[in-house]
Each structure stands twice: as structure tokens, then as C-alpha cells.
Amino acid sequence: MWKRVHLITLSEFFGLLASNPFLVLVMVLILGTIFVNGATDAANAIAEVVGTRSMDIDDAILMSVICNFVGLVAMTFISTAVADTISGMVDFGGDSHLAMIALAASTVGIVAWGVAAWIFGIPTSESHALIAGLTGSALAVSGGLDGVNMGEWVKVLYGLVLSTVLGYLAGWIIAKIIPIACANADRRKANNFFGRMQIAGAAGVALMHGAQDGQKFMSTAMLAIALSVGKTVGEMGGFPLWIEVLCAATMAIGTAIGGKKIIKKVGMEMVQLDKYQGFSASISATISLFIATVTGLPVSTTHTKTAAIMGAGAAKDIRSVNWGVCKEMVLTWIFTFPGCGLIGYVLAKLFLVIF
């Protein structure tokens, strides 16, 4: 784990920007990916609490904004395992200029992919887009697999299985147990109770989204800064508080501006949930994300939460799930890795010629 030593101040960062215009471009692109992540992944984290009408959509977005910020900052104190995995996943080589070009190429692809998915209201995974884009651009710069740390990539595959399988199964099991456990309870009181618990569960997912996705993209921002001064991320000493605030604020703005489209797709169109099912989905996703975060597995919040919602919905009646909407999402997930990897590779090759 990195020591929390602030070796670069905000004023020093502005000095780097003033002397390195390409760093300005790369940082703008990285903040663009964080913005898109806020509009898609962060919004998906609170979708079902709106779908069950436990919260108004504007109140849910405000809660998401606050919890994402707290999750990002708090988890940086507890564990940076996910950030370590992301920063160690690729090696752009010793030439910092080539490395910055590769990083710029990968972020352009991530933004383009994320915006396209957002236009259609499909909650794609910016986490997997980030991983694929970085890998594609690293392959382009290194000319082969030397630029990819396969040991860290294995963690991505483990995380992919965890996020979908564990999320779905946990959502299904908890949604099956609750009706049995509450069979003799007053229906109205139980409904009110699970409505309140669902809000708490959604807050937990938003916290873990900040912890997971916030670390991923914050480590990318630190990677850009490190490359601009010819260092590795580990040599930078840690995450300054100002970069945590910058990343969290950018994600929050993305959720506030673009979150409603994704919330409506997942929370209202994919499946209609009762409040206890919404709670089942939220608590399942929170547990899955926490396990992944502390073990350093870079998982997709989108995959985890959506799979949990599917499982909770199918537990009551498999026909209640709109499998047509699910198909759209799954196809987007499947194409994210090869699509963003190819875009990152092609753009890196193109940028190498131009710059």
C-alpha cells in the first residue's frame, strides 16, 4: 500500500500544466472519463431506489454525489489495492512522451465509448473500458505483450466473474429468503421498513462505487502526472487530497447532469422491483463490491449492481425481468473489452504518427 505522503501540491500541479500543454490535454481527457463514469456507473448504483419509489430521483442523485465523494476519500485511507492493480497493469516503457501519447489515446476511446452508450441509455462499464483502453494503447506502444502485466490482468478476470455471478446469486438468494422470513409480518410495516433499508443499501453501493471506480480513475490521473515528471506512480508517494476532491467532484457533476437517463433505463425499464427486492439488490452489490475492493480486484460497479437487480427480480418471477433490456446491456458489456482495446490500439498508433 502506498504511504499517504503528499509529494505534489496543487500549486506544483498547476506549474506542471503551465509547462506541459500535452499534460493539460491528457488531464482534460481523464476528467472527461470520470465525468462519463459519473453519468453512467454512479447513476446505475442508485437506479433501483428510484425505481421502487423509495426516493425521489433528485434526492437519490444528491445522495449518490455525497456518498461517492465520501467513499473515494475514505477508501484511500483504508486501502489503495485497486489503485495499485490499475497502475501496475500496463507498462508504457521508459519514454515519457510515448507513454503520455498512449494514455491520451486510451482516454479518448473511453470517452467516446461511454458517451455512445449514454446516448442510448445503456449503462456500460467505464471500469472495463479503462482497462481495455490502457491495454490496447500499451500493446501499440510496446509492440507486444511486454507492455501488459498479465498477473494484474488475471485480477480483472476474477473480478468479472465476481461482479456478475456473486452479484446475481446474492441478489436472488436474499430476495428469496426475505419473503419467507417476513411471512407473518404486517405487509405495510414491512414495506416501509424495507423502503428505508433500501435507501441505506443504495447509499452503501454509492459509497463502494466511489471506493472502486474513484480509485481506478484517480490512479490514472496520478499516472499522467507521474509520467509527465518521468516517475512511476509508486514514486509519487501517494494521493494528494486535492486530486481526490477533483476526481470526486468531477464524478459528482457527471451524475448530476447525466444520471437520469441511466437511472430510468435500469430502475424503471429493466425490471420492476418491490422494496424488499431493491434492498436485496443493494445489499448484495455492496457486499460484493466491498470484498472486491479490499482484495484489490478491479470490478465493474455497473455489472455488479445490474446483476444483483436481475437476481432480485428473477427471485420473485423470472418473467418480471425485461430480458430484452438485459440483452442490450450484456452485449454492450461483451463488446467493451475488444471495442475499447481496439480503439485504444488504433488511436495510439495514429497519435504516434501525428505527435
Report each predicted region and the residues it spans.
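Multi-pass alpha-helical transmembrane bundle typical of ion/small-solute transporters
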Residues: 2-355
